[in-house]
Every structure is written in structure tokens, then in C-alpha cells.
């Protein structure tokens, strides 16, 4: 499992391109019959990519759970959210099966021990994107279809940011301890996300970008608002955003991304926004 430590913004300002990518970028998430796990010390967020092809893959495959989590199983003191970004698949949670189509989401509450991932067609395998945060209480494991997500249209064509925010793991949808997740789709011709930029000092965030057409990229902006840096993102890459950092993006085409947050609270208005004219 890859371990990422927290960084001070003053140190970050001196990082090279490669140092920024090494500390914050997560690549190669989907490898056949493998669990790609990244543990961030920023609010203890866990990011996983799981692509079952020829076998059903347990969540803890090739992970020393006691060494990495200090528990007997991963979700003993954690909750998780999972999206399927590939072909049809399924997740079994302590024997209960959930069929997962493209864009579907599953919230898995704290306390489940046996979590396994499978694909219905090895020629078109599921790609499961998972985030997990510490939890203190068990709620209800809940399947959330893409069609039934709570949708919030935002932006417009004039500002090249017309998009739909699909809220899945959200206080208006279901209770969780601290994990929040959703999926934002940009319309054709729109390329900007999260502009004007903001920070939320009491929550960290992870983005994963996908549906990026071949030979296109997304420029993800991070850092303090007056001292920004960019990370070039390719299809299915993820990036860690500390609480002090903005997290905005601009693509060479439209794209889709999943956002995941955890931290002190779930108050979406607990943030500081910045005018583009004030940024550097």
C-alpha cells in the first residue's frame, strides 16, 4: 500500500513538478485482479482502485491490515464509498450481493468484514473506485444508482462550466459518519470545474478524473490561491487535495470527475471562495 504524508503549504511552494506528482497524484489505479491502495495521512483518507478480471477480488488482497490500519479488518473502524467506472460488476458485502452498473455507487458502513469485488464479463471488466474514511458509528449499507442520484445543474455555456453535480453520499441523501462523495459531469464545450476556486480548512478532498477522451488531458490546479501549481491529469488519475489547497480543473475537452471529502464536518458552506482575479 502506498503511503502519502501531509505537506506544509510553505514546503509545497518549493516542490518541483515531479515532487508534486509524487506526493499528490495517484496513477495506474486499475490493474487486473489487483487492489491498488493509497493511504493519505490527510484526514486518513484511503483511495483504492480494484479491477477484477479473472477472479473475485477481496478488498484486503495483498494488504497487511494490522500493519497498515491497526485493526483486524479494513472496515472495522471505517466506512467506504464505491463507484463502478467500468463494465457491469458486483460487490458482495458479508454475503449480500449488489449489482453495479456504470456510474452506480455503493455506500458500505463501518463493521463489514468480508467485501469482495467481481466483474460480469472479463472482456469488459468493472473498474471499482473506492474511498474510505474513519468512522465511529454503523449506519446502513446503501446502493445508490446513477439514475436516482440527486442532481444539481450548475454553470453555463458562456463561462464554459456547464455541469451537473450528482450527489450520492451526501447528507441530503443518507447519513454517514464523515465521508462525502459525488460525481460531476461537464457538458460538451465546457471545460472548467470548481471555478471560482475555494478551500475548506476543515475538510480534505480527492478528485478522480475520467471520461477524458484519448489524447486529451485535464490541468488540475492546486496550492494556495496566491501561489498555484498545476498537475497534468490523464484518464482515471486521482489527486489528493489538502485542506489548505484549492482544487480546480480545466480540460482540453469536457470530462467527468468524482469528488470525495472527509474531515471535521459536512457543512458545504464551510468554505472560503476566491475570485479568479485575485489568484496567482
Describe every region a protein language model picked out.
Residues 26-68, 162-205:
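A short glycine-rich, His/Asp/Glu-containing loop-to-beta-strand
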Residues 100-120, 232-253, 260-262:
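Conserved metal-binding segment of the jelly-roll/cupin
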Residues 86, 90-125, 129-134:
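Acidic, low-complexity central loop/insert segments
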Residues 74-101, 210-235:
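A short beta-strand-loop-beta hairpin characteristic of the jelly-roll/cupin
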Residues 52-53, 88, 214, 246, ...:
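Short, glycine-/Ser/Thr-/acidic-enriched flexible segments
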Residues 122-163, 258-280:
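Double-stranded beta-helix
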Residues 1-45:
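Non-cleavable N-terminal signal-anchor transmembrane helices
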Residues 39, 175-238, 242-246, 251-254:
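Acidic/His-leaning functional-site neighborhoods
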